[in-house]
Amino acid sequence: MAAPVYADTSFLVSLYIQDANSVQAVADAAKLLPLCFTALLEHELRNAIRLCVFRRQITTTQREKALHDIESDKAAGVLHAVPLDWPKALKYAEALGRRHTEALGARGMDILHVASALALKAGRFVTFDEKQRELARLAGLNV
């Protein structure tokens, strides 16, 4: 079995909400499926979609469609629910923060995503966030 692909929230939002990166996200996702989907990713993705409503980037109807599509993709295995070993992920997170936050300005959630990918032994990490991409690269992930 191939190593899992970890797509961060910036990538996943572009799959479910039309934005400047959506065309690229759809093209990339077609080659990378299935995408591992942790409880952390699910929470942040659902919240990011709701935040798009607050920012008036999408309507409530678009929000409901996006949330429905996420559930459909979970059921179809496009988003593959995986358990996360939190103690292991938090160990990685502490090490990443200690090594890279002061130089990169890495945010806590970005560190948690990269640490989660490491804990899951992800074969690939996909993101549209430049700082997170650099952090993942420095952590040894294929980005």
Regions found by a protein language model. Give the residues of each.
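C-terminal binding/interaction regions
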Residues: 130, 139, 143
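Active-site neighborhoods of divalent-metal-dependent phosphate/nucleic-acid chemistry enzymes
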Residues: 79-134
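Phosphate- and divalent-cation-binding pockets in alpha/beta enzyme and binding domains
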Residues: 24, 44, 92, 134-136
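Short, well-structured N-terminal submotif of metal-dependent ribonuclease cores
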Residues: 1-44, 48-65
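Active-site-proximal, substrate-binding regions of enzyme catalytic domains
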Residues: 40-99
